[in-house]
From Swiss-Prot:
One of its GO terms (molecular function) is DNA-directed RNA polymerase activity. SUPFAM superfamilies: beta and beta-prime subunits of DNA dependent RNA-polymerase. One of its GO terms (cellular component) is DNA-directed RNA polymerase complex. Signal peptide: none annotated. It holds the Pfam family RNA_pol_Rpb2_1. The keyword Transcription applies. This is DNA-directed RNA polymerase subunit beta. PROSITE patterns: RNA_POL_BETA. It catalyses: RNA(n) + a ribonucleoside 5'-triphosphate = RNA(n+1) + diphosphate. The RNAP catalytic core consists of 2 alpha, 1 beta, 1 beta' and 1 omega subunit. When a sigma factor is associated with the core the holoenzyme is formed, which can initiate transcription.
């Protein structure tokens, strides 16, 4: 027997074909959401308050300080928030301290700071009763970036940009004349030496001393001449910079100093964030820049006088490691003191080394480091600017390397917590201005924190973010896998990110650093391809928001692969050689072969085993969760795998789902972490279990009660239904499944069913990927799903009086009211069809002025005789089903309703949808198709033992699409069915073709895994042997019931007067330009005329036609289409004298055309005839006169 048994949870065992030992369990798959939000509550929120506060007034006599905050108990529980359309949120109270600096008086007060939405355990938020998700954003990391560009003459130039988290950009660039310029905040460029002089290093010799002598520096100094001898060089430079930043304003050196300080050196206006400081220190650090360069001077320890490194030594990694203390310490730092006119006069600390120029060994190049300022320095320093300029100048000398902006070392993730913190900061900054004004205006003696704080800007910012941000999305709740994928989604779009139109090919492409971090396969098809990605299965964020992936460490001394795990970011991984997870190992953990396949800086090649430093943890670390659920992924073309991964997320939860016979072992983990199942929180014993609740007695004696959700409507209109798995007396452990969620079976993801599938044609019905299906799948409810639709009706106060929900509806027979209760609301359990009343409602009609008698009748008999019209809620087209729930909200019950609404009734209707012709089906390999025919069981082809086939697929769908995985799954699935087992074949480590044939043989199948099939209609065998097996097939959310649509009389667009489009608007089918040509080609002029008039925008004509049809009269001639009037007006707007004439040659106003009963507009030919007739009549008249 090939393979080995693996237990998944308590309810399922699978035979696994994996050969690679798993050394690391998958992390919790939604930790990217939950951990980030927890960090935000623990530290992020506090940091935001500390960033913005304290706030002082303009005279600096009062100060408002932040003390702390506290989240109180949520107003509603999760279920209540869902039921009441409310937020699941907790009130937040912040303690402030107001200090009067003149009197020394201190007032401390707790201020209510609004309700803050809380994250549920599943990583979602409940906003207005619906589950939403905040998608993590993939953005460029703050830091310093260097790039090169080739001009039209083939000359290479260099550029550099410092990108902050917020604040002005600082750019450097070279031009074709080899002069280096700088730009501040995207303004006009100035020679870079101007900025150096403004920093207080004004002499030409001083600049050459700092940066070393190079052609670029000399050329730039020549360009940067001293124009005004009355100013010092620094003052002149400051004025020049001011003129660029504020053109047209009077320039002074002082105003320029304060402007530059505000732009770059003020922590409140310029923020690199922790990640920006880390990236800058890493890039400008001398250790990485000296690596593999030849040092041009002796490195001497100033304390002992010992020569650490002699001139001419190549600085290999081992040499640098040996003098790491010297390079990191203060011994090699040089202090430069700016002149007294500088922007900042504090001394500037740098590190400075001379190395041989790589391009010219006779010259030396100066390398300047920024001496790594502390992590807490979140703004730029003069040392950063000088070190950046040094790196930039070094690039022209062949030293250093340019950055790849698509490298995941340069892109980071902003998860929920950070996005919320940014939003909160925006709100607090708006509040700050408000507070400052109130502090200054009001009387200091009586002020309290409560009086000067207005929380509206903060609550508005949070509300806006959750309600309308591009990253706050309605949760994709088709099935647990789609929930999980949505929570792990990474979007490059959104505020501060890319836009679809601007994103080029490079950003969307797969990059070698995606390995183990972002899935190369799961991304949408269409305009968002490559911009929306998914986190790989083992991906994890570090504190800076870079994605890390785990590797097994290789012991360099013994050469053995250890079980020690290290998490590496993309730029850390670049320094190492990593072996693949499927490299063969000996028992002791050493590599079995001298040469192993590995990766180094994006090169996949063979490496000597001795040079390998890390090894992949698992073969599935490359791909995302949905992709890891595709068996035999390694045998599928990547384009089809992409469709397979995406279509699994569109699977509809079935009534009785089955886990796949051929799985990947990922189904258990995906179901466990999705949040759709009920998982035991503690060890214990089940003491009560039914369909509504499960009670577990813990070991310490306390009782856990779990509520089972039955038939709740999900975001996508499917039934969210949980099924109890445990019985009284079962013992459960923490983390066990105690109830399955939707699309789960025995604690495993179960998106579809395991039908018997044959690859064969049948009467041409599976042309173009269509699917032929047996009626058994309809009768036995194999692919039946339950869908819930929500309808609501509300009563409002109108000008004529309040609307009323009642059973007494005018002109409606008793038969239509049979299922309504005494209030006029449908009973639960009623079967309803299109047009049935769900909620009886009447609205007052406008009343004419009543006579005295009528007023008397009203006074005697009350309001009953008043005129009302029927505005009941009825079942729309395609909405038939069973009423499964009714919710009533009224003011009297304390429900919060919109203003003007007195009562709100919600009715939920459940539909059981069997599979039918036109529904879309798919396998897991991107093999999708539409059901074209449902064949009676007796007509389906059958196997030699009499089993009829369930589904027939077209064999032509396989070769050109290169998704051979489906054929392997088919054979292995049949073997699993015959053996009565479930199989796991993990991605990139699954069943080989030998394993497959061995299992087929064990199952007693033929050696080619094909079989003879018999035609169900004739009983004759088919000519050739057919591949028949079991394939996992899912029913997708694109169902024909939702798409079928017909229009009679419907709404028209106000402007064009043409019917609207689309099912949602009850629109028509567009009859476009090409369709008009088709009818013209057939000469079907009358059909075409009515399509372009009555059925489109002939406003009067269509009314008359409707009237004629209803009264049984002949349909009158069509009138003038609205579009003709538009055409006339457009021609007139071009200055053409366009008029419409009647038969008497009189001009007709287009508006009058529809007034008369008979149209006066004539055809051109008729006009000619009329003129001739007129001429004849005139001649006759003249003759008669003469007579």
């Amino acid at each position: 027997m090939a393979g080995h048994e693996v237990q998944y949870g308590k309810h399922r065992t699978r035979r696994s074909f994996s050969r690679i030992k798993e050394v690391l369990d998958l992390p919790n798959l939604i930790e990217i959401q939950t951990d980030s939000f927890k960090d935000f509550l623990d530290t992020g929120l506090k940091e935001v308050f500390e960033d913005v506060l304290p706030i002082s007034n303009f005279t600096d006599t009062m100060e408002l300080e932040f003390v702390g905050y506290e989240l109180k108990e949520p107003k509603y529980t999760l279920e209540e928030a869902r039921a009441h359309d409310a937020h699941y949120s907790a009130p937040i109270f912040v303690t402030f301290r107001l200090i009067n600096k003149e009197t020394g008086e201190i007032k401390t007060q707790e201020v209510f700071f609004g309700d803050f939405p809380l994250m549920t355990e599943m990583g979602t938020f409940i906003i207005n009763g619906a589950e939403r998700i905040i998608v993590s954003q993939l953005v460029r990391s703050p830091g310093v970036y260097f790039n090169d560009k080739v001009d039209k003459n083939g000359k290479i130039g260099y550029g550099s940009t410092v990108i902050p988290n917020r604040g002005a950009w600082l750019e450097l660039e070279t031009d074709s004349k080899d002069i280096a310029y700088t730009r501040i905040d995207r303004t006009r460029k100035i020679p870079f030496t101007t900025l150096v002089r403004a920093l207080g290093f004004s002499g030409d010799d001083e600049i050459i001393d700092i940066f070393g002598d190079s052609e670029l520096v000399r050329n730039t100094i020549e360009k940067d001449i001293h124009k005004n001898p009355n100013d010092s060089r620094t003052d002149e430079a400051l004025k020049e910079i001011y003129e660029r930043l504020r053109p047209g304003e009077p320039k002074t050196a002082d105003s320029s100093r304060s402007l530059l300080i505000a732009r770059f050196f003020d922590a409140r206006r310029y923020d690199l964030a922790a990640v920006g400081r880390y990236k800058i220190n890493k890039k400008l650090n001398v250790k990485t820049r000296l690596l593999n360069q030849v040092i041009a001077e002796n490195l001497v320890d100033p304390e002992t006088g010992e020569i650490l490194v002699e001139a001419g030594t190549e600085m290999t990694r081992s040499v640098i490691d040996s003098i790491a203390d010297y390079l990191d310490g203060d011994l090699n730092k040089i202090v430069y003191t700016p002149n007294e006119y500088a922007v900042l006069t504090e001394p500037v600390v740098l590190q400075k080394f001379k190395v041989m120029a790589p391009n010219d060994p006779d010259r030396t190049v100066t390398v300047i480091g920024n001496a790594s300022p502390d992590d807490k320095v979140r703004h730029l320093t003069p040392a950063d600017i000088l070190a950046e300029m040094s790196y930039f100048l070094n690039l022209a000398e062949g030293l250093g390397k340019v950055d790849d902006i698509d490298h995941l070392g340069n892109r980071r993730i902003r998860a929920v917590g950070e996005l919320l913190a940014n939003q909160f900061r925006i709100g607090l900054a708006r509040m700050e201005r408000n507070v400052r004004e109130r502090m200054s205006v009001q009387d200091n003696e009586v002020l309290t924190p409560q009086q000067i704080i207005n929380i509206r800007p903060v609550t508005a910012a949070i509300k806006e973010f959750f309600g309308s941000s591009q990253l706050s999305q309605f949760m994709d709740q088709h099935n647990p896998l789609s929930e999980l994928s949505h929570k792990r989604r990474l979007s490059a779009l959104g505020p501060g990110g890319l836009t679809r139109d601007r994103a080029g090919y490079e950003v969307r492409d797969v990059h070698y650093t995606h390995y183990g971090r972002m899935c190369p396969i799961e991304t949408p098809e269409g305009p968002n391809i490559g911009l929306i990605n998914n986190l790989s299965s083992y991906g994890h964020l570090n504190k800076y928001g870079f994605i890390q992936t785990p590797y097994r460490k290789v012991d360099r001394e013994t050469g053995k692969v250890t079980n020690e795990i290290e998490w590496l970011t993309a730029d850390e991984e670049d320094e190492f050689t990593v072996a693949q997870a499927n490299s063969k190992l000996n028992e002791d953990g050493s590599f079995a072969e001298e040469i192993v396949m590995g990766r180094h800086q994006g090169n996949n090649q063979e490496f000597p085993a001795s040079s390998v430093e890390y090894m992949d943890v698992s073969p599935k670390q490359v791909v995302a969760v949905a992709t890891a659920c595709i068996p035999f992924l390694e045998n599928d073309d990547s384009n089809r795998a992409l469709m397979g991964a995406n279509m699994q997320r569109q699977a509809v939860p079935l009534i009785d789902p089955k886990a796949p016979f051929v799985g990947t072992g990922m189904e258990y983990q995906a179901a466990h972490d999705s949040g759709a199942a009920i998982i035991a929180q503690h060890n214990g014993k089940v003491v009560y279990s039914d369909a509504d609740k499960i009670e577990v007695r813990r070991e310490d004696g306390s009782l856990d009660v779990y509520h089972v959700t039955k038939f709740r409507r999900s975001n996508s209109g499917t039934a969210y239904n949980q099924r109890t798995l445990v019985r009284v007396g079962d013992s459960v452990e923490k983390g066990d499944f105690i109830a399955d969620g939707p699309s789960m079976e025995k604690g495993e993801m179960a998106l579809g069913q395991n039908p018997v599938v044959a690859y064969m044609t049948w009467e041409g019905y599976n042309f173009e990927d269509a699917v032929i299906m047996s009626e058994r799948l309809v009768k036995d409810d194999v692919y039946t799903s339950v869908h819930l639709e929500e309808f609501e009706s509300e009563t409002r106060d109108t000008k004529l009086g309040p609307e009323e929900i009642t059973r007494e509806i005018p002109n409606v027979g008793e038969d239509a009211l049979k299922d309504l209760d005494e209030m006029g609301i449908i009973r639960i359990g009623a079967e309803v069809k299109e047009g049935d009343i769900l909620v009886g409602k009447v609205t007052p009609k406008g009343e004419k002025d009543l006579s005295a008698e009528e007023r008397l009748l009203h006074a005697i008999f009350g309001d009953k005789s008043r005129e009302v019209r029927d505005t009941s809620l009825r079942v729309p087209h395609g909405g038939d089903g069973v009423v499964c729930d009714v919710k009533i909200f009224t003011r009297a019950n304390g429900d919060e309703l919109q203003s003007g609404v007195n009562m709100l009734v919600r009715v939920y209707i459940a539909q059981k949808r069997k599979i039918k012709v036109g529904d879309k089906m798919a396998g897991r390999h991107g093999n999708k198709g539409v059901v074209s025919r449902i064949v009676p069981v007796e007509d389906m082809p059958y196997l030699p033992d009499g089993t009829p086939v369930d589904i027939m697929l077209n064999p032509l769908g396989v070769p050109s699409r290169m998704n051979i995985g489906q054929v392997m799954e088919l054979h292995l699935g049949m073997a699993a069915r015959n053996l009565g087992i479930h199989i796991a074949t993990p991605v990139f480590d699954g069943a080989t073709s030998d394993d497959l044939w061995e299992t087929v043989k064990e199952a007693g199948m033929d050696s080619d895994a094909k079989t003879v099939l018999y035609d169900g209609r004739t009983g004759e065998p088919f000519d050739n042997r057919v591949s028949v097996g079991v394939m996992y097939m899912i029913k997708l959310h694109h169902m024909v019931d939702d798409k079928l649509h017909a229009r009679s009389v419907g709404p028209y667009s106000t402007i064009t007067q043409q019917p609207l489009g689309g099912k949602a608007q009850f629109g028509g089918q567009r009859f476009g330009e090409m369709e008009v040509w088709a009818l013209e080609a057939y000469g079907a002029s009358n059909v075409l005329q009515e399509i372009l008039t009555y059925k489109s925008d002939d406003v009067t004509g269509r009314l008359k036609a409707y009237e004629a049809i209803t009264k049984g009269k002949p349909i009158p001639k069509p009138g003038v289409p609205e579009s003709f009037r538009v055409l006339v007006k457009e021609l007139q707007s071009l200055g053409l004298d366009m008029r419409v004439l009647d038969k008497d040659d009189k001009e007709v106003d287009l508006r009058d055309l529809d007034e008369g009963e008979d149209d006066d507009v004539m055809h051109v030919d008729d006009l000619e005839k009329a003129r001739e007739k007129q001429a004849l009549e005139a001649a006759e008249f003249a003759n008669s006169d003469e007579k």
